[in-house]
Amino acid sequence: MNKSGIIILNKPKGLTTNHLIQKLKRKLNVKKIGHAGTLDPLATGVVICLINNGTKLSDYFLNENKAYEVTMKLFQATDTYDSDGSIIEEQEPFKIEQEQVEKVIAKFNGLAYEQEPPMYSAIKIDGKKLYEYARENQVVKVNKRLIKINSLSLDKYENNEISMTVYCSKGTYIRSLIVDIAKELNTIAHVTSLNRIESGNFIIKNSVNIENCEESNLIKMFDAIKMADYEIVELDDTLNVEHGKKIEVIAEKNIVFISNKSKELIACYERENGNVFKCKRGGLNI
């Protein structure tokens, strides 16, 4: 397939994100493939797959907010913060009232805070991924990251399990959030299920399973950027844009995509001053 754009897949449990996109690459005979945000093997849900020139749009989808459905199991901790890991601590269950759970959830609802990523993650330190250090039992300093829990709501609390829906900023680790929530409840916990239901404006009901995915599921680059709420300016003459020169356009936003009249994305531009824009990312069509 020579076309470019994105495909929204619903990742099944047990696959790595890379394994998923490689399966898609083989199935559709794609030359170049990528994704805009990894999911843990245990997790399911929305993965934005970038096809051919669509890989050049990675940053513009990575920066979007996310939404998840998550279930946490109380009184049991694992090294990976989820049920794929080894149990490292267990507590005798004790009574936690639903009112307590609701109070803690309310505390995190709308909260911006410095979150510590889990050691079992793909963050790189000195060129090496954190999970590689963890597997070698090496202790490294991990910088906390400012994240925001835009919305957190309780869906169900029973049998020592708490199910919630989370809307959060990019870079949020749900596994770490669950550990932080457990601390506020004076206990330990780990994730037993995690489902990404939204990535930016791309939602799970519009996703497709890898088994049913076809070329017709491709969303063209122009349409994908429009769906992501970026501003697109169509020009009759795109010669200056193709050469990466500054241009003058009237636009509402500071970041705009430039296309020709055939709705082919050419480049991404950012406002320099007034109506003058400079090239931020060119060659989107080549």
From Swiss-Prot:
Keyword Isomerase: yes
SUPFAM superfamilies: Pseudouridine synthase
Coiled-coil features, chain-numbered ranges: none
Matching PANTHER family: PSEUDOURIDYLATE SYNTHASE TRUB1, TRNA-PSEUDOURIDINE SYNTHASE
Pfam family, any one: TruB_N
Xref: CDD domains: PseudoU_synth_EcTruB
Enzyme superclass (EC): isomerase
Its job: Responsible for synthesis of pseudouridine from uracil-55 in the psi GC loop of transfer RNAs.
GO biological process, one term: tRNA pseudouridine synthesis
HAMAP family, per database record: TruB_bact
Organism for this UniProt entry: Mesoplasma florum (strain ATCC 33453 / NBRC 100688 / NCTC 11704 / L1)
Catalytic machinery residues: 40 (nucleophile)
Name of the protein described by the UniProt record: tRNA pseudouridine synthase B
Family membership noted in the UniProt record: Belongs to the pseudouridine synthase TruB family. Type 1 subfamily.
Example GO molecular function: RNA binding
InterPro entries: PsdUridine_synth_cat_dom_sf (IPR020103), PsdUridine_synth_N (IPR002501), tRNA_psdUridine_synth_TruB (IPR014780)
Keywords attached to this entry: Isomerase, tRNA processing
